[in-house]
Amino acid sequence: MKELILETRIHVHAWEELGEEDRQLADAAIEATHRSYAPYSRFSVGAAVRLANDLIITGTNQENAAYPSGLCAERTALFYANSQYPDQAVTALAIVSRPSDSSSISEEICPPCGACRQVMLETEQRFGHPMKVLLCGAKNVFIVERASHLLPLFFGSDALK
């Protein structure tokens, strides 16, 4: 029997350690949480993507009474960016959550769901460019250098050949 050990390198930063670009992206995701539509979960999520041309696009979770018809913030931002700027690689993505009845972001990070990870991976592969991921909580910010590192055993376009 052969054993594989899969590891993910995550850099844990205090907010004051973030560079200007990362802080700007995280702040855009925080601001986006206030436009979330989350009347059922009361859990607002904001995502911000930075494109290769330095444009920042934001998205929020959009819930619907007919579960699972809603959409996560990450996919809202990525799909908009990819449809409106199809020639611009996504270079970074920040994700933030907060309780809808609070003005403060959640203490802990909000990791992306499996569907969002798959879309993040596809976006990274589509452009052939790494997408840095910032998972932001009030305590600290986790930074992963590539979206593919969040989904080590992934289903990609090569599987369809």
Which residues does each predicted region cover?
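Short Pro/Gly-enriched beta-strand edge/turn motifs at strand-loop
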Residues: 27-34
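Short, compositionally biased leader-like segments
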Residues: 1-27, 101-103
